[in-house]
């Protein structure tokens, strides 16, 4: 077998850890909005607010996590520490059923763990390849698709355990999954000796009376407590504003650090891709909030007398990602000709177009509910599957481009900024969108019909919004195609 055509052996341990991280994160996420509304009896407004705050802050911390990995911990140690914290957070969340005061603390611990894990798992994968290695795009697609095995199994397993036993057991299962992934990853340590490790010189250096490892321990204790206060006082939006401002300052600093026109061009491409990713995920993240409650209330979930738990529907788009991702990874590996920038914009246009198509199907489903009281399950499954397929043309493409940039020591921070915009801000926008479906704004006389009409309106607006994004991206694609062909003709002449 051609060694250049096969993936590095270390990728399989990264993929295994990603699978279990997806299991842990998405198992908990599938339960959270339902836990808030059905168990803790939050109204829709309050539940959407806390859910979007959690999903926003979970993407703010990767900036700090990326910085710590770049300067002190290295990607491998940051990933392991993040996985451990997430497991602890899920266990504490299970206790919040008995003591609701643990709710904010548990979410804060998960947020901190996710910050260390999420941006650095992609950077760790990037360390396995040379910058121009043609296997790189295929590796990222494989990571993204295989990781979704966890996303498929988690809502089914955690949803079933919650339904049959308790909410606490459902969250505990998510924690067990994360610990299992960490153990598997540790078994493959020998394959990562060439990756960047802990910077012991920086870690042991003294700053303001304490060595840096002492400040790191203080940070690991103080950060969850601070984030707990943000949840409790509902101040997360202010943290988001501050984080965004810091991210923009850091981005400007990186731009000044770029020494060549090629580096600045690559950085500009990353920024533009990030903005479109932000809009894409503002639409896609309805899956964990408004779409989940829509399914719970207005979709017929009965199969031969068995009512399918709402959480299990979170598996549908993940299954679509896994099913189509392997094929896409093969196509990317084989199709390496042509201009890379043109291919990138073509993929983004396809991803946004599929998202628009998915919400068009959900709009039809909501209209069916408005007319007949409940919508059919197959129509809902089809819409979620199309939306899942769309994801393959957004994140893997953008992350591959970020790890490709030829500016030393910035990939972790750039990944964190990408997570901030396409994750934190996108989730905040998703919360604003989802709040338009909240029942608390409806009067009692026509609550049910009015609620369904709100879902129809929101899903339809997202359909047109995503389609408008497709139009803009296609214009960029046409411009890049024309420029590439003009250069090719100039070279031939």
Curated annotation (Swiss-Prot):
It comes from Salmonella typhimurium (strain LT2 / SGSC1412 / ATCC 700720). This is Dipeptide permease D. GO terms for cellular component: plasma membrane. Belongs to the major facilitator superfamily. Proton-dependent oligopeptide transporter (POT/PTR) (TC 2.A.17) family. DtpD subfamily. GO terms for biological process: dipeptide transmembrane transport; protein transport. Keywords: Cell inner membrane, Cell membrane, Membrane, Peptide transport, Protein transport, Transmembrane, Transmembrane helix, Transport. The chain crosses the membrane at residues 14-34, 49-69, 91-111, 138-158, 167-187, 212-232, 235-255, 267-287, 312-332, 344-364, 379-399, 413-433, 458-478. It holds the Pfam family PTR2. It is found in: Cell inner membrane. One of its GO terms (molecular function) is dipeptide transmembrane transporter activity. It is a multi-pass membrane protein. The gene is dtpD. Its main location: membrane. Probable proton-dependent permease that transports dipeptides. HAMAP family: PTR2_DtpD_subfam.
